[in-house]
Amino acid sequence: MASQGTKRSYEQMETGGERQNATEIRASVGRMVGGIGRFYIQMCTELKLSDHEGRLIQNSITIERMVLSAFDERRNKYLEEHPSAGKDPKKTGGPIYRRRDGKWMRELILYDKEEIRRIWRQANNGEDATAGLTHLMIWHSNLNDATYQRTRALVRTGMDPRMCSLMQGSTLPRRSGAAGAAVKGVGTMVMELIRMIKRGINDRNFWRGENGRRTRIAYERMCNILKGKFQTAAQRAMMDQVRESRNPGNAEIEDLIFLARSALILRGSVAHKSCLPACVYGLAVASGYDFEREGYSLVGIDPFRLLQNSQVFSLIRPNENPAHKSQLAWMACHSAAFEDLRVSSFIRGTRVVPRGQLSTRGVQIASNENMETMDSSTLELRSRYWAIRTRSGGNNNQQRASAGQISVQPTFSVQRNLPFERATIMAAFTGNTEGRTSDMRTEIIRMMESARPEDLSFQGRGVFELSDENATNPIVPSFDMSNEGSYFFGDNAEEYDN
């Protein structure tokens, strides 16, 4: 990307840091995940969890959610001002699963938020360590991306459910900062903007007064984030139009939906980071690994290496397939929900199947599910190779877009073609090229029409052996060119509901 110079790297976003060199970045990311690990160990001690219980991904998620809730200033304030029956605004908790007499038992725990904040700060050298909190949010977001489909949310905002590959990070909370904005897909940003515009249409005062001024600033900031994800001049120019609109209405919604569709071929740059569950960092810290001294990167070999020697368990429902549960967790760990299955399968070393063929439900277990029949199994999170996570979207030939398929947003920087059904996508662009954005629309459609499904993206990029930590010998896989690689193809997953 041309504007690379103005951007901070992910790690800088992740750690809130100013310009740092590679070593400093590795150290500060290491400090961040080390803090998460120390916090997790301390929580296991507080809760008197056995080694096996501490490695249970469901327990990890409960502990992560507790600390996120303890630091959710806005919600805490809201809860204190609007007391609801049976909810103590000063407490947080969730289900903890314990092994008793050969069975798994659920225990609901409750903690003072103040106490959780104290433990978190203590694990992070007395600091609030917001970067670590964002990291946990992104892990939860990646898990949601792999587990649920957002068809209903897409349809509600007037978008096409086939645009699901653009929806990375759609469940991230608003307070996830720059690191959160980097991992949001084009569709996610478009959906947030459309919701905002719709509120403005229905509520006259939304853009007015002191509050309206703040709203307007937020609107323009979101427009700029989305603009920064687009890689062609025409798409960016259209975003300028949307941003500068005097009072945003249906014309802007139309433009945004057009841009979202165009991103299926002229893909946006969306960051990918391997964010692992807290228990994985905890295990490493407990075994004496010093993250800050060794350094750590979210986009290189480190997460792969960490997963190679971490044993994590998951609760399994009676008719679920443990191998499928592992695939879900693996995809979440590597932020690969929207990656081409051919690439994921090659890296993982076992076939990654589309979600419609998975016999597994989500990782989290509802409070009304019967624990009597629950079993646990080891999650297989290891990989055969590792690859660098990308943020380019695979459009390496700048102005002329490369191919994109309905439903791929590349995660790994690995050479492949991005097959797509041009007819399906282009059918969505019927006629409407009048109005202020007509020349940009025409230009965007022209670029989309010239894209070829057989074009290679990430030329010369390959995967690496796990012993090759400096990425010296890329192995460039060859893929069956015609093969569709979409995870959401023929999908029957449940909807994500808050």
Curated annotation (Swiss-Prot):
Xref: InterPro entries: Flu_NP
Annotated GO MF terms: RNA binding; structural molecule activity
A Gene Ontology term for the protein's cellular component: host cell
Primary localisation category: virion
Pfam families, per the entry: Flu_NP
Keyword Flavoprotein: no
Motif range (Bipartite nuclear localization signal): 198-216
Keyword Ribonucleoprotein in annotation: yes
Region described as Disordered: spans on this chain: 1-21
Domain of life the protein comes from: Viruses
Motif (Unconventional nuclear localization signal): 1-18
Subunit annotation: Homomultimerizes to form the nucleocapsid. May bind host exportin-1/XPO1. Binds to viral genomic RNA. Protein-RNA contacts are mediated by a combination of electrostatic interactions between positively charged residues and the phosphate backbone and planar interactions between aromatic side chains and bases.
HAMAP family: INFV_NCAP
Role noted for this protein: Encapsidates the negative strand viral RNA, protecting it from nucleases. The encapsidated genomic RNA is termed the ribonucleoprotein (RNP) and serves as template for transcription and replication. The RNP needs to be localized in the host nucleus to start an infectious cycle, but is too large to diffuse through the nuclear pore complex. NP comprises at least 2 nuclear localization signals that are responsible for the active RNP import into the nucleus through cellular importin alpha/beta pathway.
Name of the protein this chain belongs to: Nucleoprotein
